[in-house]
Regions:
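C-terminal transmembrane bundle of multi-pass solute transporters/carriers
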Residues: 68-72, 79, 83-95, 99, ...
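Helix-loop junctions on the cytosolic side of multi-pass membrane transporters
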Residues: 136, 140, 182, 188-211, ...
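Glycine/proline-centered helix-kink
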Residues: 39, 159-170, 248, 280, ...
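Helix-loop boundary and gating motifs at the non-cytosolic
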Residues: 6-64, 222-272
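Intracellular juxtamembrane helix-capping segments at the cytosolic ends
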Residues: 41, 129-142, 332-345
Length: 415
């Protein structure tokens, strides 16, 4: 059993800590800026081209720079003042949103879509810094025994931004136009920068010459690969999302199976995030200390069962309920993996390890959508999703069998 929490160790107590509250504010406002701009860009690009393929190029223009910059971003986070580096990253978001505002309103004399793609590429490079900076500063504003609760609140903030950002972007475009939406994205990035500018945190002292950049990046990769708990948790999450992602297929299910209009898409898209937020709030109040490995494996298995259930469901509200649990199980995985990342990473490697984790996450999200579409094309919509659910169950079983260190994990042992 865990020890009773003091007032400062409760979820509300953590929010009363100015450093942690400002760090969470930085995270959600940076996320809102990115998400509002991303939704507006999709509308902007399609309005200009009327070509669905151009929407796919938006994702490519963002993710390729992210993958190229992420390893170097982790190195810089580990060797430069993190708060100032975060402010530079926020200035990149501001510059991107300002350029897009100028293009949308005609202030900048650019024509065609390539300036928009260039701005999105800059966003991808900036995004490579956002999570490593958050994770590195997280460990400077909380004590180690507060990491589990803090990770739960961080997951709630992240999911809230994922839900509110696209919704707000759509509303702003609908009622005020693209220029207003981009301007609001600029304002959100300014608020994120202000949060970091006023954040009082003791930065780690860097003594001695820095290792060569590629040697340092390789050192971080070797650390992750050599840590069976960390690499097991990352791989488990990556393969479960890669094989069991159903969000990309929601429009097809609504059209072909559930026979619901576009308003149903908003409901179904919100359900996983709602489930994740609920479980994040619960785990912030009741953090896991014992049997975290078993809980993680059961959560992934539950995630797989939800994928199977969603694939077989032919009723809209049953599908919505299943997606709620789908998000809840995924939320458990996110919180446990985030806590492992914070507890098991040495201070001097937080940036590099967080960047590697970001590459795992982005790989599963981006490739998962491609995999889901390919399998649906080859096997049909329902068989592809059901098969993906069984594949997730297999991944959970194989991990439990092959990685007993992760299976027997108690988070208290890492503190």
């Amino acid at each position: 059993m865990s020890e009773p929490a003091t007032a400062e160790d409760t979820a509300l107590g953590l929010l009363s800590r100015p450093g942690f509250a400002k760090l969470l504010a930085y995270r959600i406002f940076a996320m809102l800026s990115y998400q509002v701009a991303a939704v507006t860009v999709g509308w902007h690009i399609y309005e200009v081209t009327r070509n669905p393929f151009s929407l796919g190029l938006v994702g490519l223009a963002e993710v390729l720079p992210f993958f190229c910059v992420a390893p170097f971003a982790g190195y810089l986070v580990d060797h430069l003042p993190r708060r100032r580096l975060g402010m530079v990253a926020c200035s990149g978001l501001i510059a991107t949103a300002l350029v897009l505002t100028g293009v949308a309103t005609g202030w900048l004399p650019f024509e065609g879509v390539w300036p928009i793609y260039a701005a999105i590429a800059l966003t991808g490079m900036v995004r490579a810094f956002l999570s490593p900076i958050y994770n590195a500063l997280f460990a400077r504003v909380l004590a180690r025994d507060q990491f589990a609760r803090g990770a739960g609140l961080g997951a709630v903030v992240f999911q809230a931004g994922m839900v509110a950002g696209p919704a707000l972007g759509g509303v702003l475009v609908g009622f005020g136009g693209k220029g207003l939406s981009y301007a609001v994205a600029t304002a959100f990035a300014l608020v994120a920068m202000a949060c970091l500018a006023t954040l009082k945190v003791e930065e780690p002292m860097h003594t001695g010459p820095a290792a060569p950049i590629f040697k340092s990046i390789a050192e971080g990769a070797r650390f992750v690969v050599g840590n069976r708990i960390m690499v097991g948790a990352m791989a488990l999450d990556m393969f479960s999302v890669l094989l069991g992602g159903v969000v990309a297929m929601l429009p097809a299910f609504l059209h072909e199976i559930l026979h619901h209009g576009p308003e149903g898409l908003g409901i179904l898209r919100a359900m996983p995030a709602l489930g994740s937020v609920c479980v994040g709030l619960w785990l912030a109040r009741h953090p896991l200390h014992r049997n975290a490995g078993r809980v993680l494996l059961f959560a992934v298995a539950g995630f797989g069962l939800c994928v199977i259930g969603f694939g077989l469901s032919q009723h809209f509200w049953l599908s919505a309920l299943i997606l709620l649990f789908y998000g809840a199980f995924d939320g458990v995985s996110v919180v446990i993996r985030s806590t492992i990342l914070q507890l098991a990473t040495p201070e001097e490697m937080r940036g590099r390890v967080s960047s590697i984790n970001g590459i795992f996450i982005s790989s599963s999200n981006e490739l998962g959508a491609f995999y889901a579409g390919t399998m649906a094309r080859l096997l049909g919509l329902v068989p592809a999703v059901v098969l993906g659910g069984f594949a997730v169950l297999s991944v959970a079983g194989i991990t439990a069998w092959k990685n007993p260190t992760l299976r027997k994990l108690n988070l208290r042992d890492l503190q």
